[in-house]
Amino acid sequence: MSLHSPLPRAFYAADARTVAPLLLNKVLVSADGRRGRITEVEAYCGSEDAAAHSFRGMTPRTQVMFGAPGHLYVYFIYGMHWAINAVCGGAPGHAVLIRALEPLAGCDAMHAARGAAPFKSLTTGPGRLAQAFGVSAVDNGLDLTTGVARLWIEDDGTPPPAAPLAGPRIGIRKAVELPWRWVVPGSAYLSRPLPRVSGARASVTGD
């Protein structure tokens, strides 16, 4: 895989719990130059995950989640914000929610999209980062892997954390005990600090 190019479809082909911590420190890029390092993610796992939109099977809303990995699943939350997810493989209905970014470039454009938001809150939260990157319903189903879409995720050479911190997901009412949220240790760019959980580290199974 070359630097500064979209992650290939094979990167997303695994279970969302495998892909999620590997997305940490990757860079979300827009064609107009906005760039942000991924600092916080959550995995959602289809029929085995009551918190996933895809838990009860495919609907018109969740159709993208049941398609090829490497596509963007975009949905509306709280009646006011968009959120972005990378569709994964492994099993039907898997996706990784991108919860927070560290802004790297194109910050003027992010500020223009977000208004007078302080720098540290430009992209700390799924709705905030989607707004900062101008994401809306038209981006649902966008292919992150082609290099011709307006958004993609790339590897700039910064490896994922060797021991990403894991904890319960945020803003859900079901499956609240599952530690399927991962963050970059020590990052100042999180939607919410991670509660200390003894021995919590990245896990393929979520145990």
Swiss-Prot record:
Under Enzyme Commission nomenclature, its number is 3.2.2.-
Q: Read off the Pfam families from this record.
A: Pur_DNA_glyco
At the top level, the lineage of the source is Bacteria
What's a single GO BP term from this record? base-excision repair
Q: Which InterPro entries match?
A: Formyl_transferase-like_C_sf, MPG, MPG_sf
Q: Which GO terms describe its molecular function?
A: alkylbase DNA N-glycosylase activity; DNA binding
Tell me which PANTHER family the record gives. DNA-3-METHYLADENINE GLYCOSYLASE
Q: Which family does it belong to?
A: Belongs to the DNA glycosylase MPG family.
Q: What is this protein called?
A: Putative 3-methyladenine DNA glycosylase
Q: Which organism is it from?
A: Xanthomonas campestris pv. campestris (strain ATCC 33913 / DSM 3586 / NCPPB 528 / LMG 568 / P 25)
